């Protein structure tokens, strides 16, 4: 998984995750380590680019929602970009959908302003 960290608007640090392929429960463990490191480091703003993801396990969606709640507790957020219609359906079928979706990284960055 490729990860970038950049300084964005209002001096907020925004991290990017760019996973690829299928995000399974086992595959989520790598992402989870990075999410925990972000929290420990005081970084609470994340954009996940799903343009290279072919499938996401529904249990992973639940875990992402839990992390989003943790980030929001500290004034941050997790936002998604480049979500295919297939992935959107998986996310929507989870029952509720708290994530903001943007068509591009630039649009998501602006939303953190």
Enumerate the predicted regions with their spans.
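A secondary-structure boundary/capping signal
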Residues: 18-19, 49
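Short beta-strand/loop segment at the start of cytosolic alpha/beta domains
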Residues: 1-18
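Amphipathic alpha-helical interaction surfaces in cytosolic regulatory modules
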Residues: 25-99
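Acidic phosphotransfer microenvironment of two-component signaling modules
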Residues: 85, 106-107
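Inter-domain helical "communication" segments and dimerization helices
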Residues: 8-12, 39-41, 106
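Short acidic-hydrophobic, aromatic-tinged amphipathic segments that line or gate anion-handling sites
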Residues: 100-105
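Receiver (REC) domain switch/output surface
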Residues: 112-113
